[in-house]
From Swiss-Prot:
UniProt name for this protein: Probable 5-dehydro-4-deoxyglucarate dehydratase
SMART domains: DHDPS
NCBIfam families the record matches: KdgD, PRK03620.1
CDD domains to which the protein is assigned, alphabetical: KDGDH
Organismal lineage: Bacteria, Pseudomonadati, Pseudomonadota, Alphaproteobacteria, Rhodobacterales
Source species, domain of life: Bacteria
UniProt keyword Lyase, yes or no: yes
Length: 301
């Protein structure tokens, strides 16, 4: 896809990011990954994010990422595949090139590694990555990589292939400033952990979609919530929030890293061989998996 095509795809429906399965030797397990991606692509997600945050990008080596992208492309049918990308500038540029060579449709630029940086440094980083690829690029505003509206506007002027903005800050004032300033120059995605909890607020700030983690294991329920959100059906949204998302949030909040580990547990519980999370994350306890299993069983469709 060219940058404008991936921009349109990103804004055309509910998105998700498959977990990355590992085998007993802690290696990427391509076969179960492809089985899961093929299943997810049947639930009308226009884009799936391979090797994203929930796909444990932070635990992958740069060499593993193009293999994951190739596996996703082979099994996703018509669903576009956007890859995670990040770390320091030169590593990120290399990942962008390798993803493009592997057939990826775009990249999601996650925060750089560890240090804080001034706006000029963030500008230089994003610009350098955009210049390394012909694919569409989406920036992920969160943690130590928060672009301000003026910086983002400069990047949009200088980088034609910068087509998307994903927010993980929860700063509605900033994101509304960005959407007011940039208008339809970008596609906007909500990116808070368990994005459904914030979806109504982000919709009011002109974010029409988001990436759903729970789509990994309850895609029909995720689609039902998204359809209700877009239809203005507040009663259905509140019903699903109360019956599923708030209990899931309580479980997810028990330990740091469970925003990923709980999703991977959910994927295992619905029958896919996702394997464990990689260190430094920890898997749910047996008791916690039983709680999650009961929650899933109550919402099977």
């Amino acid at each position: 896809m060219d940058p404008q095509q991936i921009k349109a795809a990103l804004g055309s429906g509910l998105l998700s990011f498959p977990v990355t399965p590992f085998d007993a030797e802690n290696r990427f397990a391509a076969a179960p990954y492809q089985k899961h991606v093929e299943w997810l692509s049947g639930f009308d997600a226009p884009v799936l994010f391979a090797a994203g945050g929930t796909g444990e990008f932070f635990s992958l080596t740069p060499d593993e990422i193009p293999a994951i992208v190739r596996a996703a492309k082979e099994s996703a049918g018509k669903t576009a595949i956007v890859s995670g990308c990040g770390y320091g500038t030169e590593i990120a540029r290399g990942i962008a090139r390798s993803v493009e060579a592997a057939g990826g449709d775009g990249i999601l630029l996650l925060p750089h590694y560890l240090i804080d940086a001034p706006q000029e440094g963030l500008y230089a980083h994003v610009r350098a990555v955009c210049q390394a690829t012909g694919m569409g690029v989406m920036v992920y505003n969160r943690d130590n990589a928060v672009l301000q509206a003026d910086t983002l506007a400069r990047l949009c002027d200088d980088c034609p292939n910068l087509v998307g903005f994903k927010d993980g800050t929860g700063d509605i004032g900033l994101v509304r400033q960005i959407t007011a300033k940039m208008g339809d120059r970008l596609t906007y995605l909500g990116g808070m952990p368990t994005a459904e909890l914030f979806a109504e607020a982000y919709l009011g700030a002109s974010f029409t979609t988001y990436s759903s983690a729970v789509f990994n294991f309850v895609p029909a329920l995720a689609n039902k919530f998204y359809a209700a959100l877009r239809a203005g059906d507040r009663a259905t949204c509140e019903s699903i929030l109360n019956s599923f998302f708030y209990p899931f949030m309580e479980l997810r909040s028990r330990r740091k890293g469970y925003a990923v580990a709980a999703v991977k547990a959910g994927v295992r519980l619905v029958g896919f061989d996702a394997g464990p999370v990689r260190a430094p994350l920890s898997d749910l306890t047996g008791e916690e998996e039983k709680i999650l299993e009961a929650l899933i069983d109550a919402h099977r469709e």
